Amino acid sequence: MTDTHSIAQPFEAEVSPANNRQLTVSYAGRYPDYSRIPAITLKGQWLEVAGFATGTAVDVKVMEGCIVLTAQPPAAEEGELMQSLRQVCKLSARKQKQVQEFIGVIAGKQKVA
């Protein structure tokens, strides 16, 4: 009789065969000596379906015989107040002081002279 630990467990493939793509490494010419360098081109609507919409940042991990592409989540949009603060930081010291005084007036901490 077979021991329970030696029974093969069925498993599902990590990637559906329908999601597999076949590519061929081509080349791109490099100016000025026109040397050929290896190139892989990925394009198709399936990229967006897979989470790689136009403009998506991509993390690339390279190993021997394996390249892993990972879509990076979009950065959280900065709030309007933080954008304004970054603009104020670029101003001269005199203008920064004026902004601070204005905020004090709006907050009711200072009186207008």
Swiss-Prot record:
Keywords: Cytoplasm, DNA-binding, Endonuclease, Hydrolase, Nuclease, RNA-binding. Its EC number is 3.1.-.-. One of its GO terms (molecular function) is RNA endonuclease activity. One of its GO terms (cellular component) is cytoplasm. Pfam families: SymE_toxin. Its main location: cytoplasm. The keyword Nuclease applies. Involved in the degradation and recycling of damaged RNA. It is itself a target for degradation by the ATP-dependent protease Lon. Belongs to the SymE family. This is Endoribonuclease SymE. It comes from Escherichia coli O7:K1 (strain IAI39 / ExPEC).
